Amino acid sequence: MKVDFDDLNNIFFVGIKGSGACSLACFLNSKGYCVEGVDVSDKFYTDEILSNNKISYYDNIYEFSLKQLDRSFDLIVYSSAYNKDGLQVLLEAKELNIPILSYPEALGELSRKYYSIGIAGSHGKTTTTAFLGVLFNKLGLNPNVIVGSSVKDFKDNSAIAGISNIFIVETCEYKKHFLNFSPNMLILTNVDYEHVDFFKNYEALEEAFLQYINNLKKNGILIINSDDNNLLKIKRQINRKDISIFSYGSGDLSDFQISNIAVRSEYFCFSFLGLLNVELKTVLFHNVLNFSAALLALNLFLESNGKSIFDFEEAIKRIAKNYSGIKRRVEVVKEENGVIYMDDYAHHPREIKNTLFGIKNFYKNKRIILDFMPHTFTRTKEFFADFVEVLSAADILILHNIYLSNRENFNPDELSVKLFLNIKKINKNTYFFKDVKDSINFIKSLLISGDLFITMGAGNNFILHDFL
């Protein structure tokens, strides 16, 4: 369905607490649209973002009726977490002939009038989008940005409504959602088998990424991480003579190589694109890759406008050194009584492995206490052995029942306990609490000065920080 956002005024979001839907709602709200929505009453990190943007919403999504509203709407946007034919509010909108778009469809329609830069990949797309958005914004390029989490340098918002024609957007591979998007420039961070409820094998996922590359506008630009073998394989299959392909990475196969990598205090120091001794505030090496992707994209954009990153060298170095991070990405929630409290969104075995390795390497003398909530039954089942291996690396592990997605109807109890028992065989310091809040007193009894406590996963165990 074609929609011209210039003709719209009132927009209603169904599932407004979803990370993408929330970001788009905030973006449109900042652009002057009248935005409202509905979702469940459960607490999500997006509650705070919506509140900060003064966006009102109802919390009874399954019972909600459009009759509760005192005005009509020009467009309904629904989160892809929900079935279009499964909610009363969407069925009512259809009967009333109100245009209905999924979040990725709405994003695609909105992007048509901009010079768009899409960021995708199995891991790191949120951070890379944030890096690129922060760079463009702080260098005065007035971008429009939509990120799947709140960015501290955006005043804890997940979107920026700029005045330029630049549109920087995080795009997702799940259910091929990113195929609604046709960018001028595309950054691919990596490709890893994921979303097993939709992609039946790795080849199906790979084909989706190839389709996305083919969605690039004529004479578009593709940026890939040459440290990722799967992306190198995909690169060999590209049959677009009109697009320009550039690669970044720490290995010799990259067009633009990251070098002189070192850890200094709370910074990774490196050189890239001729910029020497860039100090990036991060504890994880893969963020060096993500920042380098953003730098390369920035430089290519600047060069097309007669400039380069050397015109902004000192400013870029300041941005890297003072980068404040994003919500739920190795986020330091607080430091209290000698304990560091962190939260991270890692929910795939590769993400967990990289994050744990980075934290252990950075905080060498700290005891790592990991509280993990598996997310989705299908992911836990498919990568069961990998989860057992990577989670057992924590000094102390606390597990909870699998957090099911809205699309799943499984009973999570048996698989959750099975995961716990298999890890317990490897790491005796593994504990299981079906419900998150049941673990509060136990965690309090564990923590001593010098510990690092981190909640991890795409579930709701991050609420523990409110009680510790």
Curated annotation (Swiss-Prot):
The keyword Kinase does not apply. It is found in: Cytoplasm. Keywords: ATP-binding, Cell cycle, Cell division, Cell shape, Cell wall biogenesis/degradation, Cytoplasm, Ligase, Nucleotide-binding, Peptidoglycan synthesis. GO terms for molecular function: ATP binding; UDP-N-acetylmuramate-L-alanine ligase activity. It catalyses: UDP-N-acetyl-alpha-D-muramate + L-alanine + ATP = UDP-N-acetyl-alpha-D-muramoyl-L-alanine + ADP + phosphate + H(+). GO terms for cellular component: cytoplasm. Pathway: Cell wall biogenesis; peptidoglycan biosynthesis. Its EC number is 6.3.2.8. ATP binds at G121, S122, H123, G124, K125, T126, T127. Belongs to the MurCDEF family. This is UDP-N-acetylmuramate--L-alanine ligase.
